[in-house]
Amino acid sequence: MKISGIYPNQQAINVNHKKNNQIQFSGWQNIESKCLGIFDLDNTLMHGSHEEIKKIIELVSGRNGKKVYATGNTLEQVLSKQKKLALEGIDLPTPDYLISNNGQFLYENIDGFLVKNLEYETMLKNKTHFESEKVLEKMKNFANIPKYSFNDQEYNKLTQMNNFEAIKASDPDFYKSKITHYLWSPSDFMSEYFIASGVNLKEFQKDIQKELADIGIKTKFIDNLYPKKIMDKCPESILLQSHSLRRSADESMTAMFLCPADKADGVEYLKRKLNITYKEILMAGDDDNDISMAKLAKKGAHFIAVNNSSIRLQAYCMKMKNKVSSVFMSQFEGAKGILEGIDKVINRSVNN
């Protein structure tokens, strides 16, 4: 495979290996191993040219690998973005597996169609007993206890807002609270909330975890800090619920997802299903919801943080780099950053 400019070592690796072994190199670390290439989509794999994406897919496939997309998007959103890219002349191939909704659902490519893996869904249900409606009912009461409600001064500010009645109408169960429920990717496996600036997230998680445990539900928490530029693009209903009293001083907004799983759960399931070792798993991401995958580097998996990663992901990966050698901080954004990281992993395996 011809590899261009900024990855000068890759072509030499392929040529030298074929010369010495006369077989195709498989896996990221070992000869004749299966491997996984797992990529976030928005601002990661999809943030690149047709040629860059093509190179990444070829590198995974050429090493006896399965290509996996791990995203916060729903299946429908992924298919829509795939079509949009095609109109721009960019081919985003259908993956072998899709981990969607931040790990809540897993789809398998069967004859070109992404089919929901019911075994994964059943496993999560049996393990957590998670039901979004039950979580929401519990949250309606929990969010309005004094600890998580606006104080008198804050509530007075709220009532003085020009759009107070619209806020109240859009948020009838939560408008007095520092916590509000919203709908972005509705699912039985996810309950979505905005958490006001100033709320202690660790305390909140501990408090609601206990409340849900009382009704037999286990939950995970995925929090994302969305900057102003993203929040400003949201529909009107979301803007009403993420008003100024809930935002940070820089107008960013913390979202908290209560769910039975995260992206790492999907990765762990595929590892078991396909009988693949951690060192043969390579992942890349850019956002807070990719931290769960980055944590798998502790077990030997490889994680690439692309250069346009969120502040939280960068901070976590910088800390991890001091402990493990399988975390790579790329100099490049998106797909180009993935290629740089893959080159680093392959070089390490050859040199070792």
Where is each model-derived feature located?
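Conserved acidic, metal-coordinating active-site core of Asp-based
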Residues: 149-284, 288-296
